[in-house]
Amino acid sequence: MEVHNVELQISAVRPDQYPEQGYPEIALVGRSNVGKSSLTNTLINRKSYARTSSQPGKTQTLNFYRVEDQLFFVDVPGYGYAKVSQKEREKWGKMIEKYITSRKELKGVISLVDARHEPTDDDITMYQYLRYYDIPVLVVATKSDKIARGKWNQHESKIKKALDFDGSSAFQMFSAQTKMGKEEVWKWIEDRMGE
């Protein structure tokens, strides 16, 4: 998709704040600092449109980015950040659960994991949760440029094994630095938009 127009339409905490256009929505989930903002910026050809942060746990709302008046990217609060209080985490958890389980415009979820490491317990829980609700998932392994190309298959296998990867899900190695995987991620998104 050629992207020229992107706008942060709303940062929502409740369903009554969600956009009403009815465009397809693709949510981005992952632990804090896994690279959600970098993926978003790469997909929309911007250097720093989605706020990248060296402070994990920064995103505390569902941020709806309107792309070309055709779809929304929904940046979901990062999970697994220790300095956020238990009460805050529970509040986010309920907000995310409500969105994922009841939003009819949600066409798929991009679940980000760090390609360099095995998925965390939170990554595994999120993936299994999405599969339980039968939501189409693309697992994107970020920071792939930090791994020697000859070891990609080994890392992919470890990630899939840890997640108990389901054949109905998709998987993509990705690098915001080199843009590797960008076209494949867009293809998956466009396929979901048609559903």
UniProtKB/Swiss-Prot annotation:
GO biological process per UniProt: division septum assembly
Annotated SUPFAM superfamilies: P-loop containing nucleoside triphosphate hydrolases
One cellular component (GO) term of this entry: cytosol
CDD domains noted in UniProt: YihA_EngB
Residue intervals of the EngB-type G domain: 22-195
One Gene Ontology term of the molecular function aspect: metal ion binding
Cofactor field: Mg(2+)
Residues that coordinate or bind Mg(2+): 37, 59
Keywords associated with the record: Cell cycle, Cell division, GTP-binding, Magnesium, Metal-binding, Nucleotide-binding, Septation
Binding of GTP, residues: 30-37, 57-61, 75-78, 142-145, 173-176
The keyword Isomerase belongs to this UniProt entry's keyword annotation: no
Pfam families xrefs: MMR_HSR1
Protein family (similarity comment): Belongs to the TRAFAC class TrmE-Era-EngA-EngB-Septin-like GTPase superfamily. EngB GTPase family.
Known function: Necessary for normal cell division and for the maintenance of normal septation.
HAMAP family assigned: GTPase_EngB (MF_00321)
Protein name per Swiss-Prot or TrEMBL: Probable GTP-binding protein EngB
